[in-house]
Amino acid sequence: MLTRHAITRRADADGVDAAIVERDYILAHVVAQLHRATPKDGGTLVFKGGTALRFIHIGDYRYSADLDFTVIGGDVEPAIAAFGDVLEAAKQHAALPYLELTNEDRPAISFIGPLGGAKPRHIKVDVATDEHVESIVRRTVLDIWPDLPDALPFAVYPAEEIGAEKLRCIIQRVQCRDLYDLFRLTEDVGVSLAEIRPLFERKARAMRIDPNSFPDRFEDRIERYKRRWNNEMGEHLADPPRFDNVVRIVRRHLRGAELLDS
């Protein structure tokens, strides 16, 4: 396990709270062991979401707060049981004083890490079985922390699947990170919204969501994104990009995909 000083030094360098960096350290060690997740019913635990962007797809990315998975070909309970094996391996490799899976109202990781403390902190874990998934890839964790184990591949959404779900999420909720993630996916990864639009539409319909509601929902959310931008994104980045610039660029990509009127 890295020292408390190593965590606070990186927090100072990145301009975020040390607790955010410690959580990232724990997440990285958990993700690095995902190859061990083998549900006994033959299902596949597939890593997804913004945390997958940070640890798999984009080296310089925002900090994340939780873990999201989809189970393909299996049920939630065996997948969560297999995830317990992942945590045990992460705990042993990193020599963490405490790392356990709790499953009361919903699954979560409880941990005590390099910063210490009398009480464990928590990371939310979401495991879905109702997602429409068309492709998965096998990737290894990026070398974000110096004491991670040897990288072995595991199942994860490709960037296009994540982008399509981010489009659907804009219809479903108001979270600034969805807008930020679309911004980075289009600008830095080269995801084409025009190419993933049919996938987004299929994902939306699979959840009984009308994809044609996207333009109105997007416009309805802009003011709320703006009010919350600095505070919400400040939990993930020291210096969030200017909101107006992000919206301008995302709008351009959405118009190119005919998801917004020209």
Label every PLM stretch briefly.
Residues 1-46, 55-67, 71-262:
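Structured mid-to-C-terminal alpha-helical surface segments
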